[in-house]
UniProtKB/Swiss-Prot annotation:
Its EC number is 3.6.5.n1. GTP binds at residues 19-24, 136-139. The gene is lepA. Residues 7-189 form the tr-type G domain. It catalyses: GTP + H2O = GDP + phosphate + H(+). Belongs to the TRAFAC class translation factor GTPase superfamily. Classic translation factor GTPase family. LepA subfamily. This is Elongation factor 4. Keywords: Cell inner membrane, Cell membrane, GTP-binding, Hydrolase, Membrane, Nucleotide-binding, Protein biosynthesis. One of its GO terms (molecular function) is ribosome binding. It is found in: Cell inner membrane. It holds the Pfam family GTP_EFTU.
Length: 601
């Protein structure tokens, strides 16, 4: 196979908000260039996980190579990198974008620009992309292409006069998109003679091949049998096979500059291949790695426990398998007095947490309980050291802590004008500070700084419900700030329940504690003795509810007779109850845990 002229290659990605038709457009492009026969076409070819298809989101970046003969008679190679659109996966997005020179910005002509479109477009602009706007769904009666064009120009500031109007569903005008890619996007640059330098875009685990690595060659040539070095992980491998995706794997002898393909090199674990790493030849390495590589840091932590303790080993095996495929997910063992053995897991964000939990339940048939999600706090100790706290139950003695810092995020919320008041109130209730508010057409764009701790519970659900689903939300972590945070413990019958302890802001502690106690009062079944349910900060009780005792009518056999006889029986019962309360164990049912952890409004 001869080397392709570099000016016939186009690497592009598609940037869009969820549901604006990104994967459908990708399907049409694949169909039109004849990469798959009609029989093999399924909806959303590139979203290979069931969960991706069902939720209509793209999680892992995928790629496909299309051959397209343009109207000028030349055959071009188009490498489409399908990027995730969701905020939790921004790092994956940035790496996919770094592998391309241009982007198609897909905007739904009936809905206009959304918050995540903005976030990803700005990333594309940061990566110096040429951007071609595409208006999708123009066959809908509600489509307003002119208004949306104007919106793109106002909000994003790119020229939308030549935006391509299409309908990905019906296949209308798709050819024009391909022509625009060829005409407007720049070809890649690269030097064949230079030492090998390639960007590791993504990696996943294949049962037969081991780890498959998706690469974009920047300089040099990657050949079969070469010995390569991953510069960030500092590991050396021999390349077994090289190929490209048309969406099916097809082997090739070599990949030249500007090309995108995959390699396998009997790598055992996905954790050894870090997204964004630089790959070079071991014998003749490149001088400097590619910029922008950073190890993935989990943001949200929560404990996952099997409902049935006997399932623990299965859970451990399942976690290991998922970790093979998703290096951004981390876990370690933990035990809890209330829930038994389980794992403390770290995630990129809430969607990531939901997806991992759903995949564990679905693909491995496990029943799981997850504890309340928490974020990573920084504790500045009195002796001058700094510790990270992942689990509120491990909090050291308050006297040894100087200050506690919590992560803050910068959130951008786009909402229709009618719901602006409720959205501002929600942000205010969550200890937010307003940074900016301006109007984009008929919609308000609000920028807020919020503590991540307040967002991880149910901020997203609340935002959707107060705006009837119209508000869209995007965030990135900005910095750590000192906060007046306290550890709230829940005591049942004067015994602390570790799985329910949490760090809260002092101003919110009382209301949160009271709500938790009320909830548990309804959920824990009554026992033969009275049970106090308390919320405490240190030694100070801030809220209490009492679960009444079930009492047996001991005086039922006394008909009439002396009052002292009845009193003797009642006193005897009282003594017994007192003893029970001292030694009695309160069993908290699983349902109570699940419901108490879900509670948060």
């Amino acid at each position: 196979m001869t080397a392709k002229p570099i000016d016939t290659i186009r690497n592009f990605s598609i940037v869009a908000h969820i549901d604006h038709g990104k994967s459908t457009l990708a399907d049409r492009l694949i169909q039109l260039t004849g990469a798959l026969s009609a029989r093999e076409m399924t909806e959303q070819v590139l979203d290979s996980m069931d969960i991706e298809r069902e939720r209509g989101i793209t999680i892992k970046a995928q790629t496909v190579r299309l051959d397209y003969t343009a109207q000028d008679g030349r055959t071009y190679i188009l490498n489409l990198m399908d990027t995730p659109g969701h905020v939790d996966f921004t790092y994956e997005v940035s790496r996919s974008l770094a592998a391309c020179e241009g982007s198609l910005l897909v905007v739904d002509a009936s809905q206009g620009v959304e918050a995540q479109t903005l976030a990803n477009v700005y990333q594309a602009i940061d990566a110096n992309h040429e951007i071609v706007p595409v208006l999708n769904k123009i066959d809908l009666p509600a489509a307003e292409p002119d208004r949306v064009k104007q919106q793109i120009e106002e909000v994003i500031g790119i020229d939308a006069s030549e935006a391509v109007p299409i309908s990905a569903k019906t296949g209308l005008n798709i050819e024009a998109v391909l022509e625009a890619i060829v005409a407007k996007l720049p070809p890649p640059k690269g030097d064949r003679a230079a030492p090998l330098k390639a960007l590791l875009v993504d990696s996943w685990y294949d049962v037969y091949l081991g780890v498959v690595v998706l690469v974009r060659i920047v300089d040099g040539v990657l050949k079969k049998g070469m010995t390569i070095r991953m510069m960030g992980a500092d590991a050396v491998y021999g390349v077994d096979r090289i190929g490209v995706f048309r969406p099916k794997m097809q082997d090739v002898a070599e990949l030249g500059p500007g090309e995108v393909g995959f390699l396998t090199a009997s790598i055992k674990e996905v954790a050894d291949t870090r997204v964004g790493d630089t790959i070079t030849e071991d014998r003749r390495p490149t001088d400097s790695p590619l910029p922008g590589f950073k190890p993935v840091q989990p943001v949200v932590f929560c404990g996952l426990f099997p409902v049935d303790a006997a399932e623990f080993e299965n859970l451990r095996a399942a976690m290991g398998k998922l970790r093979l495929n998703d290096a951004s997910f981390s876990y370690e063992m933990e035990t809890s007095a209330a829930l038994g053995f389980g794992f403390r897991c770290g995630f990129l964000g809430l969607l990531h947490l939901e997806i991992i939990q759903e995949r564990l339940e679905r693909e491995f048939n496990l029943d799981l309980i997850s504890t309340a999600p928490s974020v990573v706090y920084r504790l500045n100790m009195s002796d001058g050291t700094m510790r990270e706290l992942h689990n509120p139950a491990d909090m050291p003695d308050v006297m040894k802590i100087d200050t506690i810092e919590e992560p803050w995020i910068r959130a951008t919320i786009l909402t229709p004008d009618d719901y602006l008041g409720s959205v501002l109130k929600l942000c205010q209730d969550r200890r937010g500070t307003q940074i900016d508010l301006n109007y984009v057409g008929k919609r308000a764009m609000v920028v807020y700084d919020l503590p991540l701790n307040e967002v991880v519970f149910d901020f997203y659900d609340r935002l959707k419900s107060i705006s009837k689903g119209y508000a869209s939300f995007d965030y990135h972590i900005s910095d750590y700030r000192e906060g007046d945070l306290v550890k709230m413990s829940i005591l049942v019958n004067s015994e602390p329940v570790d799985a329910l302890s949490m760090l809260v802001h002092r101003t919110r502690a009382e209301s949160r504690g009271r709500a938790m106690c009320e909830k548990l009062k309804d959920l824990i079944p009554r026992h033969l003795f009275q049970i106090p349910v308390q919320a405490a900060i240190g030694g100070k009780i801030i809220a209490r509810e009492t679960i009444r005792a079930l009492s047996k009518d001991v005086t039922a056999k006394c008909y009439g007779g002396d009052i002292s006889r009845k009193r003797k029986l009642l006193d005897k019962q009282k003594e017994g109850k007192k003893r029970m309360r001292q030694f009695g164990k309160v069993e908290i049912p699983q349902e109570a845990f699940i419901a108490a952890l879900k509670m948060d409004s």
